[in-house]
Amino acid sequence: CTYFLTNGSTSGVIASVLACTNKGDKVLLWRNSHPSHLNAVKLAGCEPVFYNLPLNKEWGIPNKTTPDLIDVKGIKAVIVTSPSYEGIISDIKELKDICKKNGAFLIVDEAHGALYPFSDELPQSAVNIADFTIQSLHKTAGGLNPTALLHINCDINASKAISMIN
């Protein structure tokens, strides 16, 4: 199900983390992730576990998430930004498979990918793959500030996630 958010994608990240974790759970996030990711983890009383993205030596920017380097054992949720600020796309399907195998939720901050579902010429969207996908309509889709979407694609009670931000 999909919900419109009027407090930006940050509220979607917070709702997602609060909905799928409990106090003391471990949440994996990128070392260079948006501040809202760490804030959501702290708000939930969870323990952040940081993942350092490998660097693309040619461009000097963080590369995509490398699933073979991610250890999700004991992790309750994984937060990924795709596309990244540099436009790097991670393999969301592969990440979801790893998370599912280890009982972790996958939260994708797709703030800059709101238009992905509308063209086969664009990268595949996380909307139908990840457990939670957050998109910012105001960044790439012409929405008013701070319009965003929260897509929930798991067995979590959606009303629990929404009650966290209402």
Where are the regions a protein language model picked out?
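A short glycine-rich, hydrophobically flanked beta-strand micro-motif that places a catalytic Asp/Glu
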Residues: 4
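Conserved PLP-enzyme active-site core in the AAT-like
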Residues: 7-166
